[in-house]
Amino acid sequence: MDARQRTRTCVRTRAGQKTGLPRGARQICLPMDRENYDRLWSDAAAMRQYLDELLKSCPELFPTGIEHGFQLTGHLPESKKLPGIRLRQLRLTKGGVFTLRPSFVLTYMAGTVDDVDYPLLLLSFGVPTWVVTRGFGHNDMYWQRLVERLGRNSLVGTTVRDPKRLPQHLAADEHHAAWCGEKGYAALTAGAGCLLGVALTEAADDDHLRDAYGTFRDEVRNIDPTYTPKTVNTDGWKATQNAWHGLFPLLAVILCFLHGFLKIRDRIRKDHELHRRIWDVYRAATRIEFAKRMRDFRHWWQGKSWAGPVREALEKLWNHRREYATSYQHPGCHRTSNLVDRLTNRLYRVLYAGRGLHGHQASSERRLRGWALLLNFRPYAPRSGEPRTHQSPAHRLNHKKYHDHWLHNLQISASMAGYRQST
């Protein structure tokens, strides 16, 4: 316990605005296991028939412009990492060259889905990399890089496959993380049960948070250039609210009622009648009823004796009544930050298991983004006595999956790195 803490110097500043597409954005991932690969891959006629059928059922996997025609222009050299595996090349009639990769093969030929399925599932639950290395071989950096490579994909584009299913109501918050011996902030954006934005920044002021949440704005606008969410639920941190207003001026910010309750509960934990009355106010069905219940609640607690910190928290709840009532103007919005809090809790456990973040800003952020994709696509725990309707949070959001295997589904959804491209 007396050992001196050692932290290496790392770059904590976010890089400037990126204009180009990331690595892997020119690679199309096709739903295909090894058996179908051996049967179809070397047969040009069979491959073209397969692609034509796939274009009809899943056009979002391909760049716009492919409907005007394409040619299969041969194979790439055989992989040295995976003997017997060769990628194919596809050339569009109107220009543009893409690589075809079967979904059972990982990017960079780093392995196959069957090899890394269970290890990645363990990593998504925060199992330390040294444990995974001991059980499945390779080394710690191999498994860390697998997760980081997933983080290069568009988090929004990979998770949301249909622009019509982009959530209109979001929840956002910052998680305080230990980062190279100092404090860092992971800006999280959640919607429809999925993590749609994760960005790492060194400060939580207006400029840093606008830049961090701006990653979500850029990725979602790649899917739908006109997209503007209706609401976002945040806590009372002004920099968070200012950042979202700066990114989406027409957005309505909903103040989290849960945070107001927690400030009171933390100061007086055993007064269950007080707690019940607060939630009775929250459960009001209309804005008028909410205002009436809030006034009645204030009249009740003003006639009682409270400790100074409790009374101060109650006054703050009353002073924010108009911000809380805004939620009634937007049916379907998140009135509490419960959605993002649940996902933050999972992130907290992963970071705790790894004792925080230890890399540069870019690599640490990619690791968080890769973990978020694993979280969105990993299978739900089985229920006792009844099968689940959906395989994963992403399946529930899209009402569609490309493959019965969760990691195949993630690989295919990350076709062209999750970006929509036109030629």
Spans of model-derived segments:
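Residues immediately flanking
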Residues: 174, 236, 260, 377
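C-terminal domain-tail junction helix/linker
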Residues: 31, 37, 42, 311-314, ...
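Long C-terminal interaction/binding lobes of large macromolecular proteins
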Residues: 24-47, 212, 217-219, 250, ...
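RNase H-like nuclease fold core
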Residues: 145-232, 238, 242-243, 250
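Short, conserved DNA-binding cores of transcription-related domains
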Residues: 2-106, 354, 365, 369
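Short small-residue beta-strand/loop micro-motif enriched in glycine and branched aliphatics
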Residues: 98-101, 194-199, 353-357
